[in-house]
Amino acid sequence: MEKLGIGYDTRHGRKVVAQDICAHLQRGELTCLIGANGVGKSTLLRTLSAFLPPLSGEIRLLGKPLVEYSPKKLARLLAMVLTHKTTTDNLTVRELVGMGRSPYTGFFGTLTTEDETIVEESLRSVGILALQHRKLHTLSDGEYQKTMIAKALAQHTPLILLDEPTAFLDYPSKVETLQMLRRLAHELHKSIFLSTHDIELAIQLADKLWVMEESMAAPLPAKKDAGSHLVVGTPRQLADDGTLSRFIERDGIHFDTASLTIHISTK
């Protein structure tokens, strides 16, 4: 992203959410986007996934402007996992994951032997091969989320974007999901980018954090760009420069920069 401006049009005019954002995603890394409600995380994610056009600046993917890709070509480079569930509850797990191959199949969507192999590898990568014949409506929230991640893997894209993938999961499933996404980013050399409100898990498991905030007073070594709403760095960098303390700490809530943990006062 180079000098990116994000926002959207409303009945009352254009709403500018953030401007002059400069950042990049690396392959082989898990990057987590965190920030307060209403600060613009969803708008940024929708802009990165080409659902919203940028107001200014440029997004480049593999060195080429995002707007120059056709929808079919973009679907081979970028996979998106949304929070809401699909309405195709009568599909099986394997059938839904197979839909991830649609950018590569012909008009009728017939899967080749190679496609079927990729589907099976994707199911195995997230640990749900044994669930492949289950109907979607029989799955738990955690199993369903794994199915959607497997579908994204089946697209064989270098970039996967996820909108709050742990939002409706219990705590053990949240941990398992983020651990799995970190592993997939590292093992498959993918860039995996997600928004989340699970701050402490993101701090512990992300390779990089993108923190959206209204104040841009954070110093180096964390990367930042004056005028944007985004501070980028490793969890350690953002702890040392005060970004995480500024974002997390309130009355009764303390962020320990040494251990990267959050402590809540009981008094």
List each model region and its residues.
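The feature captures the beta-strand-to-loop junction immediately N-terminal to the Walker
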Residues: 34-36
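Helix-to-loop junction immediately C-terminal to a conserved catalytic motif
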Residues: 49
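Conserved ABC transporter NBD signature motif
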Residues: 57-65, 74
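Conserved ABC ATPase signature
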Residues: 135-139
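Catalytic Walker B motif of ABC-type/P-loop ATPase nucleotide-binding domains
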Residues: 160-163
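H-loop/switch region of ABC-family ATPase nucleotide-binding domains
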Residues: 196-197
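ABC ATPase nucleotide-binding domains
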Residues: 236-240, 246-267
